[in-house]
Amino acid sequence: MVEEIKNFKIETAHNHINLYQQCGRLELLSNDNELQSLIDLEKPHKLGLRNLEHLMSVLLFIPRPDRILMLGTAAGSLLHFLRHYYPQSEITAVDIDVELVEKMLQIEVLPPVGNGLTYVYDDAAHFISASTQCYDLVLVDVFSGAQSPAWLLEKSCTNGLYQILGEHGAVAFNLLIDSEHKFKLFYRDLRLVFQRQTLCLPVKGLENTIAFGIRHPLTARDMAWYMDHAMEMSEQLEIDFLQILSVIYNTNPVGAGVI
């Protein structure tokens, strides 16, 4: 990653982005000044936003993923994280905004193509419906303005995501939904499609909601096992998974699905 990046704006047909570098960090803000992504320029693999740390807690519930699909790239903090901690995994990053991705690659903010990483320029909904591949982990980080797009909340999309998961795969959603009713409908459909193998969790201090759908029923584990597993994963990935696990248990009823 380049050491010096001047502050500038990127305007495309899909995004109006402000990029600022300060205090060794790169901040990506929307046109209305909302923080969308944050990268530590010295340690780009270290996640700087709480919602992304919560999103990656899906790793507590699945085997090590060999094939990863990421829908939406933003400034690439998740891609840097995945490339650093899962160097042997094949990662496909899908984004509709060719101009933005090419610019971010040019200034070396996004990790380059190669070593298992591929960029695909496509609409995420189309990619899901047309995919013939199966993935161990699908990360959904797609927005329309400051909200999750309507198509993403439809049951047909949830069905499509279920179909492209491998036997022990999972999908993790980073959601911004301004209506509790809309979220309840989405989560009801998620639980139906994934046969109750789901989790959801709020992100303290942020409006994001994280939701997981896991394709295959997990082996029954008690809280003590998950606490030990969370401590082990915390050391490996530099994320406080114990704190996030506490949120998961406080939000989701035990015996009603995954936990």
What annotation goes with each model-predicted range?
Residues 155-220:
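C-terminal substrate-binding/active-site "lid" region of AdoMet-derived donor-dependent transferases
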Residues 2-27, 35-42, 59, 209-259:
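SAM/dcSAM-binding transferase cores
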Residues 80, 149, 182-183, 222:
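Short glycine-/acidic-enriched loop or helix-start segments at secondary-structure transitions
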